[in-house]
Amino acid sequence: MLKKTLTNFITPSDPPHVHYAAHLAYITSLSGTTDSEESGPYSPSNASLRALGAIRDLHSLATRNSHTEVALFALVLELRDLVHNGVWNRVGESLLNVEKELKLTAEFDPAKPPTTIGTSNLEKVLVVHVLIIGVLYYTHTGDYANSQPRIKKLHDMLDGAALDAFGPSGIIDIHLPNSPPLTVQVTHPRIIFTLGFLVSSVSKRDPVGRKPKRKLFAQEGVLIVDKELKKEFPCKSRFNFL
C-alpha cells in the first residue's frame, strides 16, 4: 500500500518533506516485516533486501535534491539495517563510509588535526548513533585498537551535553530549504544514556581486578535500566525511524 502511495500518489509538485516522510514510512513498514523467528546463520529475507533498497532510494533522492542531512540520515539508516540483520561482512565498509561523511575519521587518527563534528542537532544525533554502532562492531570483531577511540569519543560527547541535541523525547526536525521540516523520532535520550553505560561495559577488556571498569559500567547501566522501567515517557511511533 505504501509502495503504491510512493508510486501513484506522491507527485513531483509535493514538498520535499512529504516525499521523505513517505519513503521513511515505507522503510519502517519493511523493517518491521522481518521474520523474528528466523534462526541460524544470516540469510537476507525479501523484506530486509527491500528495506535496504528503499533506504538507498531515499539516499539517492536526497542527494539529487542536495539535502545533505537527509542523505546522511539515510546512510545511518542503512548502517543500522545491516547491523540489525547481522550482515557483519558489510557493516565495516558501511561504517567507514558513514564516519567519513560525518567527518569522524580524523577523530581516530592522532596524526590528523581534530575537526569540527556535529554542527547541527541532527549531525550530533547521528554521530552518537554511529559511535555506538562502531564500538559494538569493533568489539564484535575483536578489534580493541579501533573500539577504544570510539568509546572515548562517545564518552566525550555524552559528557559534553550531546544528549541535548535529542531534545526531551528524541523528536527532531531535519530542516529543508524552502520547505517545512521533516520531523523524525530517533532513539530517546534516556535510552541513549543507558546504552552508553552498557556499550562501555562490553567494550572494556578488564573483566577482573579490584575495580574492573566492565563491571562498574554494567552495574551502573543496569541500575539506570531499573529506574527507567519505573517511568513512562511519550514516544510517537509514527515518526520512529532510527
Question: Locations of the language-model features?
Answer:
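Extended alpha-helical scaffold regions
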Residues: 1-242
